[in-house]
């Protein structure tokens, strides 16, 4: 384990062999239990019985129906998270068998998500509260102006049920096509893409405006953020050309984030990118609240824009991302229910999180290659430099002069192998 201290990576004592052995044994036991829980939901008979016994049909407003069949489609099966799609077929309890055979059976697709860490119930409760405070679509046919019409097209996947004994959550399946696929497949006019990106800005403003009951939502943890950025710094620091620069940028990002006033924090999605957004006609639905928490709203804005920049480069898109970013932020600002000052300060922090996202991309894409012993499996030098420069540009636009001086000081001192004195900037 390591941490960034004055711009350098400091190594802590590792666990003893005995501690590691106990941790491994505990993990293996939990993995066996977890595997068993997930396996249950891959069995059609179990699923049908479970859903009937858990009164699922009443939650789907199908109390007068029974489950005829269940088609199971595992989307992702992992030790830390599994996602399974269920296509259920129903028949009316009141109709005779002959009538049921003649009529096309009613079907519905729902999605189950399992995770072993116990946060599933917390996520489900959060989804329910958010759903009832702005996304339940009740009265959707009663709107009589353009603003309300836009509001009702901004949707959330519906929380249906949670089974605490199995750590299993059921939600509706988002309809339509992923915004990411619309970007990558290049089969949609750019004007339509731009329309949905503006919708995404309105969706974020809608989410960020929701006031939640106290005590029920996970708050952003500075400790977890420090651990994450420390890990990135340690892993990327071995790059011969940009290791020191990345360390300095991450150190500066941490310093800035520590100084933020939590009074500006709101409910954020914390994973808002085109892969979690589905478009169906004029409807836009967002999924995956697994990392949602109370934190800086600029996180969602910066991450979404950074993902657009990444998609443009990765898939050679013709989108004018700079223009889209400007319009995206303007749309968010016009829809946000914040004071003018708070909105302005939020938008000013977007570059901070774009820089963080670019470094996150470097870590995700090149960490294993950096540590590979094979000379044939090293990072693409042009691409690596591109993302370092993008992060640097964002920080240079945003950072206060004092922070820029700190970065320069770190770089100079590192070249001489000495520790910088940053007390003058505190």
Description of each model-found segment:
Residues 73-97, 105-106, 167, 254-299, ...:
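Active-site acidic catalytic loop and adjacent metal/ATP-binding pocket
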Residues 131-138, 204, 208-212, 257, ...:
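A general structural signal marking secondary-structure boundaries and capping sites
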Residues 241-244, 315-320, 341-344, 357-426:
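ATP/Mg2+ or Mg2+-diphosphate-binding catalytic cores
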Residues 338-351:
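Acidic, serine/threonine- and proline-rich low-complexity regulatory regions
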Residues 49-64, 212-269, 391:
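An alpha-helical support segment within catalytic cores of ATP-dependent transferases
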